[in-house]
Amino acid sequence: MMRHVRPGDGPAIADFYARLGPESRHSRFFGACHGIGELQAERFARARQRGGDGLLAIGDDGEVIGHLCLEPIEGCSGGRAEEVAVAVADLRRGHGLGRELLNAAIRSARRRGVLALEATMLTGNAPIHALLEHCGLPWSGHPLEPGRETIRIELAASLDSVA
């Protein structure tokens, strides 16, 4: 099941990130961490109240198995853009859950008039690159500081790519 985040979801989101393996957390947060704190979890849970969106994938046991967050980018040039970040439970990777989350996020962003999604990631993040290729979205990547890159997905150019 997939649904939008709600203000009371902070503890479930924190638990999800605590259950991710070290490599997954490193890819998501660019460093060693054991999870996220209560404040960050509540921030993720309230994404919709700040003009963005958030999605949770819920497993059959009721636990969060995927999270995607869309946050408005302050002062972006060239139109309205949002930062996108996604994480999928280690044992659920490679089964299409990330694609489902990203496609739902793209539909949400388009409904809200967002023109582009941007993400910062570790350079050469093959799973994210593969996810973008599977979704059929036009995207471009640009290096940032050593070890990091940013990608941009132009939503207006990909209106027919995602149903």
Task: Name each model feature, range by range.
Residues 1-163:
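Long, contiguous binding/interaction regions
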